Swiss-Prot record:
Phosphatase which catalyzes the conversion of NADP(+) to NAD(+) and of NADPH to NADH. Shows a small preference for NADPH over NADP(+). Represses translation and promotes degradation of target mRNA molecules. Plays an important role in post-transcriptional regulation of metabolic genes under circadian control. Exerts a rhythmic post-transcriptional control of genes necessary for metabolic functions including nutrient absorption, glucose/insulin sensitivity, lipid metabolism, adipogenesis, inflammation and osteogenesis. Its cofactor is Mg(2+). InterPro entries: CCR4/nocturin_mRNA_transcr, Deadenylase_nocturnin, Endo/exonu/phosph_ase_sf, Endo/exonuclease/phosphatase. Keywords: Biological rhythms, Cytoplasm, Hydrolase, Magnesium, Metal-binding, Mitochondrion, Nucleus, Repressor, RNA-binding, Transit peptide. Induction: Immediate early gene (IEG) showing acute responses to several stimuli including serum shock, phorbol ester, lipopolysaccharide (LPS) and rosiglitazone, a PPARG agonist. Exhibits a high amplitude circadian rhythm with maximal levels in early evening. In constant darkness or constant light, the amplitude of the rhythm decreases. Expression is regulated by both light and food-entrained cues and by the CLOCK-BMAL1 heterodimer and PPARG. Up-regulated in cells undergoing adipogenesis. Mg(2+) binds at residue 193. It comes from Mus musculus (Mouse). One of its GO terms (molecular function) is NADP phosphatase activity. The gene is Noct. GO terms for cellular component: cytoplasm; mitochondrion; nucleus; P-body; perinuclear region of cytoplasm. This is Nocturnin. It catalyses: NADP(+) + H2O = phosphate + NAD(+); NADPH + H2O = phosphate + NADH. Residues 21-68 are annotated as: Disordered.
């Protein structure tokens, strides 16, 4: 049966949140103030979301679920069944966008706010202006990198001992994830540990104007968890009104000639405004201490694949990922010294421009507290410039129980950068 986007959006929320069928009592208001540096064109849907976000600090009464509003709250629940991933073994790029009607982001934000009304406010993060010369004649490209924490792993395997079980409930956590995406309005979204692609992110983000690709791990650890939602993997989304897809490659990474359980997606996109092409890639390397050589081999394999896709660095490149590696590891050094001439964007936030942030993930497990820098956005330094980057949460904001929490939905912080093409992109060396 056909469902309007409005009903669809509410259905996705309510499928996992039957409590919302009751009248919601207004709780402490949560603040969403999208910190956008400068003016940048957005899709009409995301412009509406930004306008809604600016007004979020004003108190509002949350309506009951009867009558007209029931259509809204019927929406984050009835799309694809939870077992949808098993029904899509081919993991195709996307459904036909002509058969999808857009969602109003303001309505989506309102639904998320209603679900999250009892949670504390989300913290503001500001963009740091990194421009060193006059701005480009074209609109910057905003890229978001984020390991969103697979739901099955958060509930079943990752042992976040200081995180209340209630903070991990999917019906609320997915709204925090969506809220973060809507707040920063990325043109390109690179995600890891996605285990709700078909039933949440693909149907919703496609109606916000994104085209998506999902590539699961062949032997996802999520499948070992009871009541899982299918395998986790990498997902890549881009705004269709800004970019044209030229090519897409799913890469199963190898190490010592052996195929591994880690994957990557690499896509060549063309900017509709400027006509310039670039490659965007997302990956998630092997985790855990003791696997450093394995990660190094995976990184070398990924670099070789990207070398071929970019025609020997002729095409500018952006690589986003959870590398599960500190800057002292070999795989980091491989990327820093690659012939692709890559630089790590978040080094630019340091006083000398040479140091990575002190952490991108901070959690407490049964084995102890883990504070590491594992997530990166690499870019072709002679073809692209970073014009701004989103600052990280402070230790005080993260709090003593660390991540995830009622404030923040993942154990990894999102990284967001604005890129512009250098005026002479052919001079890569």
């Amino acid at each position: 049966m056909y469902q309007s986007p409005r009903r669809l959006c509410s259905a996705l929320l309510l499928r996992d949140a039957p409590g919302l069928r009751r009248t919601l009592v207004p709780g402490p208001r949560r603040t969403l103030a999208p910190p956008v540096l400068g003016s940048r064109p957005k899709s009409p849907q995301l412009q509406a979301a930004a306008a809604s976000g600016a007004a979020r600090s004003r108190p509002r009464t949350v309506s009951s679920m009867g009558n007209g509003t029931s259509r809204l709250y019927s929406a984050l629940a009835k799309t694809v069944n939870s077992s949808a991933a098993a029904q899509h073994p081919e993991y195709l790029v996307s459904t036909d966008p002509e058969h999808l009607e857009p969602i109003d982001p303001k309505e989506l934000l309102e639904e998320c706010r209603a679900v999250l009304h009892t949670r504390p406010p989300r913290y503001q993060r500001d963009f740091v202006d990194l421009r060193t010369d006059c701005s480009s004649s074209h609109s910057p490209i905003r890229v978001m990198q984020w390991n969103i924490l697979a739901q099955a792993l958060g509930e079943g395997k990752d042992n976040f001992v200081q995180c209340p079980v209630e903070a991990l409930k999917w019906e609320e956590r997915k709204c925090l994830i969506l809220e973060e995406i809507l707040a920063y309005q990325p043109d390109i979204l690179c995600l890891q540990e996605v285990d709700h692609y078909f039933d949440t992110f693909q149907p919703l983000l496609s109606r916000l104007g994104y085209q998506g690709t999902f590539f699961p791990k062949p032997w996802s650890p999520c499948l070992d968890v009871e009541h899982n939602n299918g395998p986790d993997g990498c997902a890549l989304f881009f705004l269709q009104n800004r970019f044209k897809l030229i090519s897409s490659t799913n890469i199963r990474l190898t190490a010592m000639t052996l195929k591994t359980n880690q994957v990557a997606i690499a896509q060549t996109l063309e900017c509709k405004e400027s006509g310039r092409q670039f490659c965007i890639a997302v990956t998630h390397l092997k985790a855990r201490t003791g696997w450093e050589r394995f990660r190094s081999a995976q990184g070398c394999d990924l670099l070789q694949n990207l070398q071929n896709i970019t025609q020997g660095a002729k095409i500018p490149l952006i690589v986003c990922g959870d590398f599960n590696a500190e800057p002292t590891e070999e795989v980091y050094k491989h990327f820093a010294s690659s012939s692709l001439n890559l630089n790590s964007a978040y080094k630019l936030l340091s006083p000398d421009g040479q140091s990575e942030p002190p952490y991108t993930t901070w959690k407490i497990r049964t084995s102890g507290e883990c504070r590491h820098t594992l997530d990166y956005i690499w870019y072709s330094r002679h073809a692209l410039s970073v014009t701004s980057a989103l600052d990280l949460l402070t230790e005080e904001q993260i709090g003593p129980n660390r991540l995830p929490s009622f404030h923040y939905p993942s154990d990894h912080l999102s990284l967001v950068c604005d890129f512009s093409f250098n005026e002479e992109p052919h001079e890569l060396f």
